[in-house]
Amino acid sequence: MFIKRCSRSIFLQVVIGLVIGVLCGVGIPDLAVQMKPLGDGFIKLIKMLIALIVFCVVVNGISGAGDLKKVGRIGLKSVIYFEILTTIALVLGLVVAYSLGLGSGANIHLNELPAGDIALYTGRTQEIHGPVAFLMGLIPTSVFSAFAENDILQVLLFSVLFGSALNLVGEQASGVARLINEFSHIVFRIMGMIVRLAPLGVFGAVAFTTARYGVDSLSHLGALVLVFYATCLVFVMAVLGSVLRLSGVRMLPFLRYFREELLIVMGTASSDAVLPQVMRKLEHMGIRSSTVGLVIPTGYSFNLDGFSIYLTLAVVFIAHVTGTPLAMTDLLTILLVSLVTSKGAHGIPGSALVILAATLTAVPAIPVAGLVLVLSVDWFMGIGRALTNLIGNCVATVTIARWENDIDLPRAQAILDGRLEAPTRTGGEPLERGVVAGEGKLQG
């Protein structure tokens, strides 16, 4: 009975993969470190299709949306929402770290820190884009380069323009619209095949990480990790929970609905690995595809709530550990600098540590050499960052859809309460373009 249930449930398969990965990492570390390609390969397979999925979803949504003014309104509301929520996250991290005196009393001297370990990150702070360079970076050199480099913001810009053009041309372009809609079914079917490999990918990632880092790396920096996770939990349940409640949705059923995706993120420390499945599930809840297609890809670059908490928390922690006194002006400087640098993460490998280095560099009072203190626990904190970022973007989509009346709320509540069946497997077919999902089987 259990084996039959496992064969049908991706969630249970991922749990088993995670547990076996931990056991392998602890019991057979030499073998476990060789499992890294399994996790890396799974994420690469997912990323292979992300640009195509964003293109299909956005074009299908906008071409069938009718009013293009609505598309612009959704974009503007999304940017305003992202800025407000990430600012709250930055302030929360700052207040928690400062009020708890996180790191105080460690008395670590700068000459004790191995500065060479941070050169990899401090040397790349110039990759953080300024406002003008960032905006220019949204425009691809060519359409093909945007897809070839997997630059999601550039793909999103082209997709919005392409979908808008289809919308304006109207009936004459109906054949192209149908072709893209049919093509999206093929892409999502491929994604469904790839997602079946999630248990293997999670096993490889967890086995390698457990063997490589173990639990010893948490011993000296446990307070930082625990406070970070506690702060993320408060943000998710109190802040995001309140926002979601205003939209008529409860947080716990909402999290249960995305449990498979959250577990995959927990195993891979990457929210990219579940972007396509999340978009599909939000559409299945009854949210218009055009809204999902605009909010989720944009949020992956601009709405980084977990990263925002991490940034200010880590900066204040490093200041306290190195014995650097912080005046009110220093705290304001940290906040203002973080507001800018936290938006520069897009497209930078190892962006968390690079942007942390850039933030420390921009706040002269805090020694950038302190970055080395968080290196050993960055992967553990990366899980919390990815989970919080993902939940934040899902909540953002529901909230903005509610503002725009683009969500079938009774359907969403029925799915979350278990009265309407959720997708039986992750990564299946996309919903029809430009319509609010209305199909499903009510359970008696």
UniProtKB/Swiss-Prot annotation:
GO terms for molecular function: fumarate transmembrane transporter activity; malate:proton symporter activity; succinate transmembrane transporter activity. The keyword Membrane applies. Its main location: membrane. It is a multi-pass membrane protein. One of its GO terms (cellular component) is plasma membrane. The chain crosses the membrane at residues 9-29, 42-62, 78-98, 152-172, 190-210, 221-241, 307-327, 354-374, 380-400. The keyword Transmembrane applies. One of its GO terms (biological process) is L-aspartate transmembrane transport. It is found in: Cell inner membrane. Keywords: Cell inner membrane, Cell membrane, Membrane, Symport, Transmembrane, Transmembrane helix, Transport. Belongs to the dicarboxylate/amino acid:cation symporter (DAACS) (TC 2.A.23) family. Responsible for the transport of dicarboxylates such as succinate, fumarate, and malate from the periplasm across the membrane. This is C4-dicarboxylate transport protein 1.
